[in-house]
């Protein structure tokens, strides 16, 4: 379980997050949404251990987070892949740094590449891939070390609508298969409502938890209902419009 208690953090000498309290259980998909400047990415960087926080605590499985660790896998918006390595070697890179024996890490990489639908592309270089394929590689690399927690920082933002829908579907299927804790940062309201088992709305200046919304649309999808059916459901549309209104309220209040 991820547990964040009374978290305060600064960014560039200014308060970025104030009194953040969140929990994320195994098998849950927590989505964090809010207007620009609300501290979404700062929160993810704190959980990943990339930057320090000033007060409060962040614990994963009862252990405090003080820096990066293999128990947390991160998928970045710009993928963060190595262009001089092929798909297989990018996926295996973290395992190589961890000292995993070559044959073992290549076998794990092969399984992860297959899991994200890129089987047969192992020897292709990153510059030969589409945006959606690169994000699949990023997800495979993050999962290769079998982390307890998967963190994703607006990973679909640069993708076209069709590809974004494909990668959303892939992520939900992987979430169901692995049972991992997943935390997703996004600015896309429909994406947030569709994918979250709990949606956290942040307000800006500094970032605070405005509202927490338990949702079941992601569970309906992994149970077999189509995304088109879910997104045309009046309940989904009503929730999307409610969340949109809340985000606009915050943006207007702090503009």
UniProtKB/Swiss-Prot annotation:
Gene3D superfamilies assigned: P-loop containing nucleotide triphosphate hydrolases (3.40.50.300)
Keyword Translocase applies: yes
The entry's keywords: ATP-binding, Cell inner membrane, Cell membrane, Membrane, Nucleotide-binding, Translocase, Transport
Signal peptide limits: none
Main location: membrane
Pfam families xref list: ABC_tran (PF00005)
Top-level class of the enzyme under EC nomenclature: translocase
Chain ranges of the ABC transporter domain: 2-229
Localization (cell): Cell inner membrane
Enzymatic reactions: taurine(out) + ATP + H2O = taurine(in) + ADP + phosphate + H(+)
The UniProt record lists the keyword Coiled coil: no
Superkingdom per UniProt: Bacteria
GO molecular function: ABC-type taurine transporter transporter activity; ATP binding; ATP hydrolysis activity
Assembly mode: The complex is composed of two ATP-binding proteins (TauB), two transmembrane proteins (TauC) and a solute-binding protein (TauA).
Function, as annotated: Part of the ABC transporter complex TauABC involved in taurine import. Responsible for energy coupling to the transport system.
The name this protein goes by in its record: Taurine import ATP-binding protein TauB
């Amino acid at each position: 379980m991820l547990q964040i208690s009374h978290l305060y953090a600064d960014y560039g000498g200014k308060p970025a997050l104030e009194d953040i309290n969140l929990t994320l259980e195994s098998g849950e998909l927590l989505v964090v949404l809010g207007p620009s400047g609300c501290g979404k990415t700062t929160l993810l960087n704190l959980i990943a251990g990339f930057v320090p926080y000033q007060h409060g605590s962040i614990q994963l499985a009862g252990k405090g987070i003080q820096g990066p660790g293999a128990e947390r896998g991160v998928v970045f918006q710009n993928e963060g892949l190595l262009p001089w390595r092929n798909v297989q070697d990018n996926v295996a890179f973290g395992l190589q740094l961890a000292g995993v024996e070559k044959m073992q890490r290549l076998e794990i990489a092969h399984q992860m590449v297959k899991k994200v639908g890129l089987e047969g592309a192992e020897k292709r270089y990153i510059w030969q891939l589409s945006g959606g394929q690169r994000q699949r590689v990023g997800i495979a690399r993050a999962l290769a070390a079998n982390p307890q927690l998967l963190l994703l920082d607006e990973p679909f933002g640069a993708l076209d609508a069709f590809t974004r829908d494909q990668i959303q579907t892939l992520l939900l299927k992987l979430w169901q298969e692995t049972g991992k804790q997943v935390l997703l940062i996004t600015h896309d309201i429909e994406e947030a409502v569709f994918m979250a088992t709990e949606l956290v709305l942040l307000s800006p200046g500094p970032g605070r938890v405005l509202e927490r919304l338990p949702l079941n649309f992601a569970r309906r999808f992994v149970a077999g209902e189509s995304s088109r059916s879910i997104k045309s459901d009046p309940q989904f549309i009503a929730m999307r419009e409610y969340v949109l209104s809340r985000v606009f309220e915050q943006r207007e209040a702090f503009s």
